[in-house]
Amino acid sequence: AVAIAKANAIAQGEPVRLAPVKGVGEVSWVTPILKNGMEVPVKEKADLLLSANAAAMAAGANFVNSQLFLINEQKYFASSDGSYIDQDIHRIWPNFTVTAIDKASGRFRTRNAFSSPVGMGYEYLDGGNSIALPNGLKAYNDRYDIVEDAAQAARHAVEKLKAPTVKPGKYDLVLDPSNLFLTIHENVGHPLELDRVLGYEANYAGTSFA
């Protein structure tokens, strides 16, 4: 960290003056969880993923790839302002990709899980608090049902496979927020990173227009 700070100082136009911050002393913080995913047996986790795979295959998928990410970070933050913060951070992310294939044409379509990485424990997977939407769809808030979503994803992939090709032309486009925030991330977020601010090489997404 010291070496990086010294290297960055070479390109520094003027001294950096940090805003005064009052130290919080010795404190600790733990992600509020109801069930520690690290303590759940591996077999139970594997069985859950296999159940999701089976549900997707039964609903029309040809392939399923599922994962369960569990992270427990132990962080200690110390600052010259007098803050010493011990952090115990938990994150969980169940994810999958289902694929439906038209064997006659070789075309295929996919759909990913509707889950999100969240700062919760294994209780995130208990399937409660789902939100019923039109046409039998379900959305999820602070709980998630990976088996139910996998079956729904397979049906969506099959529907996409049967959908007609869009004819060339100009259309009004309605973007889902999950697509829009990715567009903003790539085309605005990366161009505003340090290499672009300092006038260095263009980032991997291309030249900035932000």
Which positions does each model-derived feature cover?
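Active-site bordering "gate/hinge" segments
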Residues: 1-210
